[in-house]
């Protein structure tokens, strides 16, 4: 009887191991493959539109000169900023716990800083109002809960998004020029390009992946890569002027 009971327990444990998602942490020698590269813009960079803050003198006086929109930012070499690069396929049923530390969005000079950011699903998003005027933060998701909250000067608040989405537009109902984007992922393999257009997706398990690059105005581009253990693949994305 004890032998039958032990066999049943072993079978049950095996079934649980098979059916449960793989709980993995990024990092470690067995998952040290990487995909890195640069995102380029090809063609004439669109002229940024002027931003008028005349409706709120508190905002206007924080800037020495006129401001322009941040829609397409590329340097003279064509390195493209504010592109979200991420793994879209290939991770299977692997699951990853969200980080405990929040991602911070500042409202400073009546602008969202950063303009484009990425967070994990269910990771805390801390919204900080550094301005001496009130804001009203209003994300407009397609797959997540929509919310619309006022934030007085000098205050902080926390929110989160439960589902993957690339990317959620965010506006301020008080200041119409304030626009930003938040990309949400259930895994840690993503990056947002800085001024040099570079990205680095590190600590990937070996495998074949679809890598996508998303830009708020230029759309989405994708390619497939296969990487082995401890291997680094160099790739690049090129967006062309519309």
Could you describe each region identified by the protein language model?
Residues 24-242:
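Extracytoplasmic copper-binding redox domains, predominantly the cupredoxin/blue-copper superfamily
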Residues 1-4:
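N-terminal secretory signal peptides that target proteins for export/translocation
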């Amino acid at each position: 009887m004890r032998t039958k009971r032990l066999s049943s327990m072993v079978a049950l444990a095996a079934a649980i191991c098979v059916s449960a998602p793989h709980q993995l942490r990024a990092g470690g020698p067995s998952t040290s493959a990487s995909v890195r590269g640069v995102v380029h813009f090809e063609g004439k960079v669109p002229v940024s539109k002027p931003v008028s803050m005349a409706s709120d003198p508190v905002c206007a006086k924080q800037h020495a000169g006129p401001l322009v929109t941040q829609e397409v930012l590329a340097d003279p070499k064509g390195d493209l900023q504010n592109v979200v690069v991420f793994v879209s396929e290939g991770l299977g049923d692997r699951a990853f716990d969200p980080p405990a530390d929040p991602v911070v969005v500042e409202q400073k000079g009546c602008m969202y800083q950063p303009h484009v950011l990425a967070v994990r699903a269910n990771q805390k998003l801390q919204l900080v109002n550094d301005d001496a005027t009130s804001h009203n933060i209003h994300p407009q998701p397609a797959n997540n809960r929509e919310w619309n909250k006022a934030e007085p000067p000098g205050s902080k608040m926390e929110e989160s998004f439960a589902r993957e989405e690339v990317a959620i537009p965010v506006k301020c109902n008080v200041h119409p020029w304030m626009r930003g984007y938040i990309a949400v992922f259930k895994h840690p393999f993503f990056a947002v390009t800085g001024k040099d257009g570079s990205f680095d997706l590190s600590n990937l398990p070996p495998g074949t992946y679809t890598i996508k690059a998303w830009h708020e105005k230029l759309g989405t581009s994708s390619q497939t890569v296969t990487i082995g253990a401890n291997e680094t693949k160099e790739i690049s994305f090129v967006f062309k002027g519309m």
